[in-house]
Design a protein with these regions (language model features):
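Intrinsically disordered, low-complexity non-transmembrane regions of multi-pass membrane transporters
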Residues: 1-32, 61-84, 258-289, 537-542
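Juxtamembrane interface elements at the cytosolic ends of transmembrane helices
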Residues: 19, 124-128, 247-279, 307-321, ...
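Interfacial loop/helix-cap signal at membrane boundaries in integral membrane proteins
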Residues: 21-22, 60-103, 217-230, 310-332, ...
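Membrane-core helix-loop-helix motifs of multi-pass transport proteins
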Residues: 27-31, 164, 168-264, 284-291, ...
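Hydrophobic core segments of alpha-helical transmembrane domains in multi-pass membrane transport
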Residues: 40-55, 109-117, 148-150, 188-195, ...
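Hydrophobic alpha-helical transmembrane segments of multi-pass integral membrane proteins
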Residues: 109-111, 137-166, 173, 379-388, ...
Length: 542
């Protein structure tokens, strides 16, 4: 009987596993890097030096895009562009401001947070959180966060700007580590970027690029033709992927990420964080009435939005488009940030009038001002991140790397289903440097779509495989446009948090998603023989 306690003691003394030690090393090495602002500034300067060397060494590759495509040079070459010359210096000096003001996430965050600020000032956001915390089953909270985050990537700005910060607040309110909530939501919004139960704006975009790439070897693939790749080409596979991502994201959060994060230490957080006990207070009668009226307001607004979007002559429909509903509604989908702004402000004013927290226009303006005043560190980070991303794009270094990687893969001369594994892994690698899904696919599709079609696979299946690689490394690359925002939110809960901690936190999701998604792809397409979308063939026959 004495042996059992000794065995338990030996197990208790056992150190962290190999994977945990690996994450600790990643975190340690990552945190040796300087402050994120300094890091982006140094990287921007490094790009200048590398671009000068690249042009001096005459780095160039053949442009895989067909002739006549916008952005393709007349001689069909992609050359490294140096910024270490008079022309480069003038370009930097003239565009320093526009790089910052034109950085995609900046305007999105500023406009959306004006509405969120009013919701915070009125108390609506806090009341909603308390209702969620008090009413939702605790054991389903993580799954709900991941699933909602995956679905939100139909309108990606909403997921990044609203859901990710919200998940951190909710987790803290129920006594869990806020960074675990942030990580779960980030993994859903960005790591599960291609999965969804709805057709999103990225679907027709990628389908158009795939159609043009398939046309290189088969002219029957053309816009408006019978073989045009539809926006629904991957819908069935991505619908099923949503639930796989939810399960994996939930398990990784509860089994790996939360235990590694340990206990939340409020002393390391920002001084202006809300009191976590507020999330556990019972709603007052005025707050309940305010929530009901705010909810009714949202329903009325949704009804009005439907009247503007669904009829054929609706104001939110594109009169020049007569295709899928998702294409007709593109003006509305591109107005998501504006809708977030309005859908936060109007119900917040209604709630504030009922509870007495919003008495006049000054209270509304005060809420907006408070939201803006909290963005100082983020604005500084974005300034330097925007310069780095712009410099990198100007030099063509990312595009050259993508083409070189694609050429390397073609030399393996693989056939059969196994060819998709190195293809997906290559897409994962390229995504670390080209954060835009459309930009990456525009460069690599003209290489891989014709190549894989010649060995017998349809463009629809090739596109589905690409989307796996494009999604799974979004959460571990600083080139992802919203990475700076996520880092700024995370630093509110740990002032000393560095890039290493954030990347180490997200690596388990990235690896797990990749393994799970590749497995699902092979089982769905090759073991079960199911189509990736309605009417999408698996194989291509010339």
């Amino acid at each position: 009987m004495a042996e059992a306690p000794r065995r338990r003691n030996r197990r208790a003394r056992k150190g962290p596993g190999l994977f945990t030690r690996f994450l600790n090393v990643v975190e340690f090495l990552g945190n040796l890097l300087p402050h994120p602002v300094t890091l982006f500034a140094v990287l921007a300067l490094l790009i200048l030096l590398v671009s000068g060397m690249a042009e001096m060494l005459d780095w160039q590759v053949d442009d895989p895009r067909p002739a006549g495509v916008s952005g393709r040079s007349e001689d069909g070459l992609i050359r490294a562009v140096s910024l270490m010359n008079p022309e480069g210096m003038r370009r930097i000096a003239m565009n320093l401001v526009t790089n910052f003001t034109g950085f995609a996430p900046l305007g999105t965050v500023l406009v959306a947070l004006l509405g969120v600020g009013v919701a915070e000032r009125s108390g609506l956001l806090g009341a909603l959180l308390r209702a969620l915390v008090l009413g939702a089953p605790r054991n389903l909270l993580t799954a709900v966060v991941v699933f909602a985050s995956v679905v939100s990537n139909t309108a990606s700005e909403m997921g990044y700007v609203v859901l990710i910060p919200l998940a951190a607040v909710v987790f803290r309110a129920v006594g869990r580590h806020p960074l675990a909530g942030l990580a779960a939501a980030f993994a859903g919004v960005s790591g599960g970027y291609s999965a969804n139960v709805l057709i999103g704006t990225v679907d027709p975009l990628l389908a158009g690029i795939t159609t043009e790439a398939a046309r290189i070897i088969d002219p029957s693939y053309a816009p408006g033709a019978v073989n045009e790749i539809p926006a629904t080409a991957n819908y069935l596979f991505m619908f099923v992927s949503t639930f796989m991502i939810t399960v994996i994201g939930t398990l990784v959060t509860t089994r790996i990420v939360e235990p590694k994060l340990g206990k939340f230490e409020p002393s390391r957080a920002a001084d202006d964080l809300e009191d976590p006990e507020e999330g556990l207070k019972t709603l007052s009668p005025e707050e309940k009435r305010g929530l009901k009226l705010a909810g009714l307001t949202v329903l009325v607004m949704l009804g009005g939005l439907a009247l503007l979007a669904l009829p054929e002559n609706g104001w939110f429909r594109d009169p020049a488009v007569n295709a899928l509903l998702i294409d007709d509604l593109r003006p509305m989908l591109r107005s998501v940030v504006s809708l977030i702004f309005v859908f936060f402000i109007v119900p917040s004013i209604v709630y504030g009038r009922v509870t007495g927290s919003v008495r006049n226009d000054r209270d509304v303006i005060d809420g907006m001002g408070r939201a803006m005043s909290s963005l100082g560190p983020y604005m500084v980070l974005v300034f330097f991140a925007a310069q780095f991303v712009s410099f990198f794009n100007w030099t063509n270094l990312g595009t050259i790397t993508a083409v070189v990687g694609a050429d390397l893969l073609t030399r393996f001369d693989l056939t059969g289903p196994v060819v998709f594994l190195p293809f997906i892994l290559m897409c994962c690698f390229v995504n670390l440097m080209l954060g835009s899904a459309s930009a990456q696919w525009a460069v690599t599709a003209p290489i891989f779509v014709p190549m894989l079609m010649t060995v017998g696979y349809s463009p629809e299946v090739i596109q589905a495989a690409y989307r796996i690689g494009d999604s799974t490394t979004n959460i571990i690359t600083p080139m992802m446009s919203y990475f700076g925002l996520i880092l700024a939110v995370a630093m509110r809960y740990d002032r000393k948090l560095g890039i290493g901690t954030l990347i180490a936190t997200m690596i388990p999701y990235s690896i797990s998603y990749l393994i799970g998604w590749v497995t699902l792809f092979y089982v769905w397409v090759f073991a079960l023989g199911l189509p990736v979308g309605p009417g999408s063939p698996t194989y291509y026959t010339p």
